[in-house]
Design a protein with these regions (language model features):
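Short catalytic/ligand-binding loop motif for oxyanion handling, primarily in non-cytosolic enzymes
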Residues: 17, 61-63, 85-86, 111-115, ...
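Phosphate-binding site of ATP-dependent enzymes
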Residues: 134-240
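C-terminal active-site "lid" helix and adjoining low-complexity regulatory extension at the edge
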Residues: 227-228, 243-248, 255-294
């Protein structure tokens, strides 16, 4: 069997090997398919490969990582450079205009904006100094604690479980509208009885998994249950995927009043610390990579 090579392009600061990403348990399955996988970052020496995946855990991919991706002949997610919610949300609310009813406030950034907050700290001169002294994580923890003491509406990052809903736009704190890190959307939640629901579509090439989470909270974090969905993802969602240029990722959405509402898109989906809980999804998705190795 001809050995083929696949490069996962990360950002050095992502510490890929220390995190729990859905892509990681696929690597041994690809090895069985004759595909060797290497991990590369913008700080490493160039490693040649037949194809690559742009797997940078930031909302907006830095230029250095884009330059690395340009050196490969085929790049999965190569066009997915900016996944701020303002780039895809159809539910955005402005401060003026017709009353939208209940609203929901969250960050424009992916995963609450924590990665961007960390990057801003570590790229500052105190951050570079503390990194040289091996104290960078200490500095980040101190800054995060100080940030959490700020008024909620003025923060640069927010735990996703702390996103807030308001009965009307008039109740949204004035500071929210001045904070470029936050967005206000119409509160469009899929419901089943008293539970809030979120559907998850994860895919790699033509392979996919579809499920739905039920939760007691609108942020859908304290899970009541996760169940597979037999029905395929809606065609409308597939068109969004095509428009955004995703080859691999996860979309969170709901069906509200018969209409699709896209909540979030993610090009670096994670896993729980127990990889066995995702074994079925990994086995289903991994063969999708073969489309880039004809």
């Amino acid at each position: 069997m001809t050995r083929r090579r696949f490069a996962i392009l990360t950002r050095a600061a992502d510490r890929f090997a220390e995190r729990h990403y859905l892509i990681q348990p696929m690597i041994p399955l690809w090895r069985e398919l004759g595909i060797e996988t290497v991990i590369a970052s913008e700080e490493d020496s160039f490693v040649d490969a037949d194809a690559a995946l742009l797997h940078v855990d930031l909302t907006v991919v830095p230029d250095a990582c884009l330059r690395l991706a340009e050196r490969y002949p085929r790049v999965l997610n190569g066009g997915v450079r900016d996944i701020r919610k303002r780039t895809f949300s159809s539910s955005l609310v402005t401060r003026e205009g017709e009353d939208p009813g209940p609203v929901f406030v969250k960050t424009d950034w992916n995963c609450g904006g924590r990665a961007e907050f960390r990057r801003a700290i570590l790229d500052s001169w105190p951050g570079r100094l503390m990194r040289a002294l091996g104290l960078d994580e200490f500095l980040v923890r101190v800054c995060e604690q100080l940030e959490e003491e700020r008024a909620w509406a003025k923060r640069r990052w927010i735990h996703t479980a702390d996103y807030r809903s308001f009965a009307s736009r008039a109740e949204v704190p004035a500071a929210v509208w001045r904070n470029p890190n936050l967005i206000v959307e119409r509160f469009l939640a899929e419901r089943e009885g008293d539970a809030y629901c979120c559907r998850h579509w994860v895919f790699l090439g033509d392979r996919e998994r579809h499920s739905r989470t039920r939760s007691e909270t609108a942020a859908v974090k304290g899970r009541l249950s996760v169940a597979p969905l037999e029905a395929p993802a809606p065609d409308e969602l597939r068109k969004v995927r095509e428009r955004l240029g995703f080859d691999y990722g996860k979309f969170d959405y709901g069906i509200v009043g018969g209409q699709l509402v896209l909540y979030d898109v993610n090009r670096t989906p994670g896993t729980a610390s127990d990889p066995s809980s995702h074994a079925a999804a990994v086995a289903e998705l991994a063969p999708g990579l073969q489309a880039w190795f004809p």
